[in-house]
Swiss-Prot record:
Name of encoding gene: dapF
Cellular location(s): Cytoplasm
Residue ranges, annotated region (Disordered): 279-303
The protein's name: Diaminopimelate epimerase
An annotated Gene Ontology molecular function: diaminopimelate epimerase activity
Pfam families on file: DAP_epimerase (PF01678)
Catalytic reaction equation(s): (2S,6S)-2,6-diaminopimelate = meso-2,6-diaminopimelate
Length: 303
């Protein structure tokens, strides 16, 4: 019988995260276990960040990312910050190199407790996102919600931050739109063969963006780090902002910088809530005070 694994329930600006310690184990977290944890109000999460032993020389750990519907994700910026805080508290280190399905990334915890993650380089070619058909310019593609002569949302910018994103630009409060209604339809639109994260963005100044996101495989979220990065680079790419912006998500602000070397840096907080142990096969769990330690609802709910 497999031993239980330690976990920490955390959040990154309200994005609910479970950081699971799978180091030194040959097993993985099953979809059934993830779905069971997601269905429990105490352990409900947007993503599980499962820390495994490294697979590639030069990296510290491999991070498997699991959505609340049991599917695998390529990237999760808020979850990565939670992993860094948990590991920094455990090891005393403040800089880490991780491997994920999206590639290798680095992250650093600063003296003020904020954590910066190098989210890598954005991709804009339609094949890399991917889209189901050729698109000459992903700064603005033909996709809309509502009547042809009066669409509610239209002409999103498309980008990949290791996972596909569509950013719809609006000129009024992002809360004016029924993202809970449009999100699942757009996530599963045929143009996105791997589904997509769907965001509504309002540029309020040359260095500020308000953002709400329907997260692929998770639904409405109070924060999505990769979506904030996708919105920031898309805003700069379309001339709406400069390359360093504050992205205000429902959970709070993220600082995003699209550096001259093409890498996107995301800086924000992480928060530890409680720890416990769980069975990676079944999802049965219990709360305790041991294990990984760091220092719910829809996107408008409390963190």
């Amino acid at each position: 019988m497999a031993t239980k694994a330690a976990f920490a329930r955390m959040n990154g600006l309200g994005n609910q995260i479970i950081v699971a310690d799978m180091r030194g184990r040959a097993d993985s977290i099953t979809s059934a276990a993830a779905i069971r944890l997601a269905s429990d109000s105490e352990t409900a999460f947007d993503q599980i960040m499962a820390i495994h032993d490294p697979r590639t020389p030069g990296t510290d750990y491999y991070i498997a990312i699991i959505n609340c519907d049991g599917t695998q994700a390529q990237a999760c910026g808020n979850g990565t910050r939670c992993v860094v805080q948990a590991l920094a508290a455990e090891t005393g280190r403040h800089a880490f190199t991780f491997e994920t399905r999206a590639g290798i990334l680095t992250a650093t915890e600063h003296d003020d407790g904020l954590i910066s993650v190098d989210m890598g380089t954005p991709r804009f070619d339609w094949q890399d996102i991917p889209l189901a058909q050729a698109v000459a310019d992903t700064r603005k593609i033909e996709l809309q919600v509502g009547p042809a002569d009066a669409p509610v949302l239209h002409s999103p910018s498309i980008a990949s931050m290791g996972n596909p994103h569509a950013v719809f630009w609006v000129d009024k409060d992002v809360w004016s739109y029924e993202l809970d209604k449009f999100g699942p339809l757009l996530e599963n639109h045929p143009i996105f063969p791997e589904r997509a994260n769907i965001s509504i963005a309002h540029v309020t100044s040359s260095d500020t963006i308000d953002l709400r996101t329907w997260e692929r495989g998770a639904g409405l979220t109070r924060a999505c780090g990769s979506a904030a990065c996708a919105a920031a680079v898309s805003a700069a790419r379309t001339g709406r902002t400069g390359r360093k912006v504050t992205v205000n998500v429902p959970g709070g602000p993220l600082l995003i910088e699209w550096r001259d070397d093409d890498h996107v840096m995301m800086t924000g907080p992480a928060e530890w809530e409680f720890s416990g142990t769980f069975d990676p096969a079944t999802g049965e769990w219990s709360r305790d005070t041991q294990g990984l330690q760091g220092s719910g609802n829809a996107d408008r709910g409390t963190a």
